[in-house]
Structures are given as C-alpha cells and as structure tokens.
Amino acid sequence: FKEFDRIGVPASCTINAKTAIERRAIVDAANDRGWEILAHNYEQGELLTDFSGDIDRERNVILKTLDVYKKTLKRSAKGWLSSSLRGTLNTCDLLTENGLLFYCDMMNDDQPYLVKTKNGPIVSIPYSNEINDFTLLTRRGHTTSEFLDIIKEELDVLLMRYRMCVHL
C-alpha cells in the first residue's frame, strides 16, 4: 500500500470472500483508498470448473461471494476474476445476471472486448498470467525485488503501447 500511496496511483486487486472475512484490515485499507476490488470466488481453492455441470451450484458460489463482498466493502462488485482463472461456459451469464460489468478470466487477447451473454454484454478485461504473483514468486522463484522490477518493466511496456495507440 505504501508504494501506491507514495506515487498517488489508485490500484485494483482481487480478494476472495474468505480473505475479506478473515483479513478485514487488507480489505479496509484497499477500500479506504478507493481501489477497485474484484470479486475472486468464495475461497481460493474452490474452482468454478468444479461446478461446470451444475449451474445452480456455480450460481450459489457467485451469489455467496457477492454477498460477502457487499457486506464487507459496502458496495457491489463490478468485476470478477475466478480462482485460477477457471470460469465455466456459464460464468459470464451468471455474472451479468448479477450486474457485474467486467470479467478477467479470458487470456485470449491483450485488449478489452465485449462478450455477449444472455443478459447483455460483459467486458472481458485481459489477464496476464505471465506477471501473476503466484507465477513469478512461486513457480519461477523470483524474489519480491525481482517481482517489483518485472512489474515496473511491464508497466513501461504498457505505457509505451498506450502512447502508440490512436485515442478517440
């Protein structure tokens, strides 16, 4: 939090419902700063793909998660990132059914795009697993200092690409 405060940049983060309940100080600190906090399943180990054949069970996980989110943050979730990026073919429909605006599980593009659902469109905001904390710190064994350097480099690349885009 300190580095984001120092440079004055708002951030977004994902928090699963169980963490929101058990680690309230983290949620409060992010919420007090006005960060966008994405709903991230009820608990990390519970994958929506475990319920891919049972839409009601998947819906219940999403509803339970969104309920905790609203109670702890005092606002409705706008976006969703499934644990381990494991949504199902029903996830987008279930999210729009509950008023969510964006979904971050899809990694097939590096630009946001609209996804049609039964309840209207939802924005797919791309997720890069290449700069994921778990990937870099656990799977690849980088130190936290190396992780910070990688994130800074990624931001530099994104800024360069942004400057090359046509803005309407």
Say what each PLM segment does:
Residues 124-146:
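Positively charged, amphipathic and often flexible ligand-engagement surfaces
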Residues 1-79, 84-124, 145-168:
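Catalytic alpha-helical scaffold of carbohydrate-active enzymes acting on polysaccharides/glycoconjugates
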